[in-house]
Amino acid sequence: MNNTKKRGVLLVNLGTPEEATAPAVKRFLSQFLHDQRVVDMTRWLWCPILHGIILPIRSPKVAKLYQTVWMKEGSPLMVYSKRQQVELQAKLNCPVEIGMTYGTPSVLDGVNKLQAQGVDEICVLPLYPQYSGTTTGAAYDALAHALRKVAVVPSIQFIRDYHDHPLYIKALAESVRQSWQVQGKGDYLLCSYHGIPQRYADNGDVYPLHCEMTTELLRLELGLDKSQIGTTYQSRFGREEWLQPYTDKTLESLPAKGIKSLDVITPAFSVDCLETLEEISEQGQESFLHAGGEQYRFIPCLNDAPSHIEMMARLVTER
């Protein structure tokens, strides 16, 4: 990297509750679900629903789910994010900080820490391979809001997406092959991506196109037939139609189609978190086996794998 003494990297992810408690989860969900990028419903209608119904009911339930995946060092998302930070900083030999769109440390915290180290050019890497306004767009909003609060605005390089980057695809393929080597190869590889409302895609969000492209490139890299791999969408919320096919419904239907041994990967998540560890690894396995499946293999996120750190470094140095 050129000018490493003045250039730094800001890794941006969604964020996480600070504790696996109902109050902490409530604070986090309140900030997250207040974002109009996430829920675009009219505020006067949405806010009473959010504060009167959703937060009081969901916060204790979600807190209990977090407790099932919480690590000694804290939230999995934060633990793996910090490991990424350390590894990438060593790889690039330049300052690397973390900034979360919601919760702490915030994007502003990350910018302030970088500037305190003399950084005047920041490469912002939102760790969302596939672009969506609900994630990368929200990260950009958080960055813009943060820059309003600094005395000197640094030069910014913003990486919008990397859904088709060769090193990203190779890193995914490597994780699949490692799983096959250790656990055996299933009849089918299911690529489960976080969903968004179908209406958002209808209004121009390119997210499903990026997801489909990632799956196709992974298929080609692994040499799979189109009948051996598929794309689904998880984590839907509310009654509105979301991107389909739904992951949970697919898991319930695959055994009846003769698929008894299943591999599941979550390419849209750069680190393991509640949605991968609890929803896919635990609930997903239970659903698949209950429907008649026999073997269910969850493939962890790329996290701080060397191939993932190498890809992140390349994304930064290419700019």
Curated annotation (Swiss-Prot):
Coarse class of the primary localization is cytoplasm
GO BP term, pick one:
heme biosynthetic process
Enzyme kind, highest EC tier: lyase
What is the protein name given in its UniProt record?
Ferrochelatase
Please state where this protein is localized. Answer: Cytoplasm
Q: Does the keyword Nucleotidyltransferase apply?
A: no
GO cellular component, as recorded: cytoplasm
Q: Which CDD domains match?
A: Ferrochelatase_C, Ferrochelatase_N
User: What PANTHER family does the record point to?
Assistant: FERROCHELATASE (PTHR11108), FERROCHELATASE, MITOCHONDRIAL (PTHR11108:SF1)
- Gene coding for it: hemH
